[in-house]
């Protein structure tokens, strides 16, 4: 399928909307009332630091809602205002924070049900309004909705669209797209649907395995088993890794994406030589500015003398998970929570360690004066960050009173 032509045709349809409905200002006003925080604004104005009692808070200098998320949420609010009585659906979570998605449900924006791992589009009727989330949607989903006569509101982040353009360039030149991402993540599912031949690699370890195979060969069956569900139909590692282009899920760790790109470039140089490297390797910068800014801000924050970190964001948020990796790798105790209710009485916290399920940690706040680093993922509203900070202040105040 010519995905580029389909996308162009869809965007020219009168049922397709990507720029809102002229009610953005009103939608943003409602959003600001619900999600902004006066405390967080004060902390920003105070050089991202705040002291209360024996707690000093250091906020990362880039955190929380990115402009792509703000745009997606505003468009969802605007859609409900513009279509007050129509059935409105969304193909996935709009963004990866439960509070925002719960608010959309309160506005009677319905999420498409997933049955046995597959989305059930049977309830969607012609004339229904369907929102595509910030992560985008696959070509097959867009085609189904268009054929059904739905009104499509596309909130796909422009940075995600930029990656789609990159893999389409790979496809046009018959390059295999090496996508750094999580193959089940909504964004990577969408990106791979625009690619021709593709392989999704999760991390540097998997990328190294692929590059070793390119240089030395190996067991094809083992390769295909290792990357099951992470490659295009008919993918053959013996023939489809001669020309590769690099792409990424925009929320992956910037430094790892860059390492993977350099690894593949070096591998193709070794195998084919510098004279023809451009016939075997392509790379475009598709690292999202907002993701990069938040990771860079976290790298600066962990240079401070912190007693611990709190990273706030949805547990299924890829960009939040990668923020959590930074202090952990620096040896700083860090807790990933999604909202303030995870901070329990008696100095306990329910948090999600990297790669594990939720667990309870007792005595998580040290006694005496402490310095706490705080950041949040790109889908987390400031009001959630405020609630977490207030909970920390309250916990330390209770400690002071009991002593």
Curated annotation (Swiss-Prot):
Its cofactor is [4Fe-4S] cluster. The active site is at residue 187. Binds 1 [4Fe-4S] cluster per subunit. Its EC number is 1.17.7.4. It catalyses: isopentenyl diphosphate + 2 oxidized [2Fe-2S]-[ferredoxin] + H2O = (2E)-4-hydroxy-3-methylbut-2-enyl diphosphate + 2 reduced [2Fe-2S]-[ferredoxin] + 2 H(+); dimethylallyl diphosphate + 2 oxidized [2Fe-2S]-[ferredoxin] + H2O = (2E)-4-hydroxy-3-methylbut-2-enyl diphosphate + 2 reduced [2Fe-2S]-[ferredoxin] + 2 H(+). [4Fe-4S] cluster binds at residues 66, 157, 288. Isopentenyl diphosphate binds at residues 96, 185, 317-319, 379. One of its GO terms (biological process) is terpenoid biosynthetic process. Catalyzes the conversion of 1-hydroxy-2-methyl-2-(E)-butenyl 4-diphosphate (HMBPP) into a mixture of isopentenyl diphosphate (IPP) and dimethylallyl diphosphate (DMAPP). Acts in the terminal step of the DOXP/MEP pathway for isoprenoid precursor biosynthesis. This is 4-hydroxy-3-methylbut-2-enyl diphosphate reductase. It comes from Rippkaea orientalis (strain PCC 8801 / RF-1) (Cyanothece sp. (strain PCC 8801)).
């Amino acid at each position: 399928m010519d995905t580029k032509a389909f996308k162009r045709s869809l965007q020219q349809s009168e049922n397709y909307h990507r720029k809102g409905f002229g009610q953005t200002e009103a939608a943003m006003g409602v959003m600001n009332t619900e999600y902004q925080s006066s405390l967080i604004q004060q902390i920003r104005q105070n050089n991202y630091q705040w002291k209360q009692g024996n707690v000093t808070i250091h906020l990362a200098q880039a955190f929380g809602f990115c402009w792509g998320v703000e745009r997606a949420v505003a468009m969802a609010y605007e859609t409900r205002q513009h279509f007050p009585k129509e059935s409105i659906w969304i193909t996935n979570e709009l963004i990866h924070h439960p509070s925002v998605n719960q608010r959309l449900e309160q506005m009677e924006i319905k999420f498409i049900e997933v049955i046995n791992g597959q989305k059930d589009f049977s309830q969607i009727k012609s004339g229904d309004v369907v929102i595509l989330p910030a992560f985008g949607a696959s070509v097959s989903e867009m085609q189904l909705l268009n054929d059904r006569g739905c009104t499509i509101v596309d909130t796909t982040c422009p940075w995600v669209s930029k990656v789609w353009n990159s893999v389409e360039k790979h496809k046009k030149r018959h390059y295999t797209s090496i996508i750094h991402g999580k193959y089940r993540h909504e964004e990577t599912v969408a990106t791979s649907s625009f690619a021709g031949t593709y392989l999704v690699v999760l991390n540097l370890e998997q990328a190294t395995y692929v590059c070793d195979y390119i240089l030395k060969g190996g067991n094809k069956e083992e390769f295909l088993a290792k990357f099951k569900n992470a490659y295009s139909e008919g993918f053959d590692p013996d023939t489809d890794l001669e020309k590769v282009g690099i792409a990424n899920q925009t929320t992956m760790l910037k430094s790892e994406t860059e390492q993977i790109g350099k690894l593949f470039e070096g591998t193709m140089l070794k195998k084919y030589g510098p004279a023809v490297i451009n016939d075997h390797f392509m790379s475009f910068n598709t690292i999202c500015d907002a993701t990069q800014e938040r990771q860079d801000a976290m790298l600066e924050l962990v240079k401070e003398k912190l007693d611990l970190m709190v990273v706030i964001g949805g547990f299924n948020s890829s960009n939040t998970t990668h923020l959590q990796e930074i202090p952990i790798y620096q040896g700083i105790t860090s807790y990933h929570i999604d909202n303030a209710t995870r901070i329990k009485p008696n100095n306990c916290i329910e948090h999600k360690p990297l790669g594990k399920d939720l667990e309870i940690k007792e005595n998580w706040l040290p006694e005496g004066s402490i310095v706490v680093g705080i950041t949040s993922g790109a889908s987390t509203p400031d009001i959630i960050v405020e609630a977490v900070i207030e909970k920390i202040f309250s916990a330390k105040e209770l400690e002071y009173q009991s002593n």
